């Protein structure tokens, strides 16, 4: 089981703080989140961390991993 945590606008717009799911890759996590109503546009610009390390969509996951998705920060 993978733990997915959302931060920033991703959390606000989706209403999802944390979700447990089965996935073998970061891309599968993104696909599930799209199926739950988060737009691909919102996910495209987000920072992706697995167990605190920056990764790509192609990165593989293993049981117990924590995936963190953070929307870009803007402002001045």
Regions found by a protein language model. Name each.
Residues 1-74:
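Ubiquitin-like/PB1-type beta-grasp interaction modules and other compact soluble beta-rich domains
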């Amino acid at each position: 089981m993978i733990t997915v945590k959302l931060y920033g606008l991703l959390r606000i717009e989706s209403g999802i703080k944390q979700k447990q799911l089965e996935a073998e890759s970061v891309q599968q996590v993104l696909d599930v989140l799209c199926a739950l109503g988060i737009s691909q546009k919102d996910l495209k610009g987000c920072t992706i961390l697995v167990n605190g390390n920056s990764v790509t969509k192609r990165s593989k996951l293993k049981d117990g991993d924590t995936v963190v998705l953070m929307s870009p920060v803007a402002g001045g």
